[in-house]
């Protein structure tokens, strides 16, 4: 199946970012309750970029749903995103 053009746009944007920048992008979504198709592409591309880099996202992603309930930090020792709070 072909990726949607907006997913591809976000995926390319995130591929050029450093991990701290990706964490900042994630944390800007915390508490945002608005939902649109565009946000779905954005959020999935963001999670996919963390996964592409081999980062453990199990605190925020169960393979189906992404939780933006808490901000995260990057734990370099364990190569994972850890929730704060």
Language model features with spans:
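Extended, charge-rich alpha-helical interface modules
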Residues: 1-85
